[in-house]
Amino acid sequence: MPRGIMYVETMPVSPDREADYHRWYNETHLAEITSVEGIVAARRFAPVDGNGPFIAIYELDCDDLDGAVQQLADMAGRGEMSSTELLAMDPPPVPRVYREIGSYGP
């Protein structure tokens, strides 16, 4: 089965909403994303120097990597995902899908 990741950069809508953004992302949004079949895990990262976007890495383990991402778009289109009012939309988050081409270790 193909393996890959979905990589997404996001920022809070404003510095004063950052705590709400992290709470929503960690307590609600990660569960929404990983509810899609084939998206098996999620991790978030912050820049060490405090500058730049936060990133989320979603692990994909499915036959159709792009199809998993399309399921997310379909869910959003049907209104099945929580509001994105805490996300900065300029520029908008863009999911990037990468397929695994090698690995080392466990």
What are these model-predicted stretches?
Residues 1-106:
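Macromolecular interaction modules
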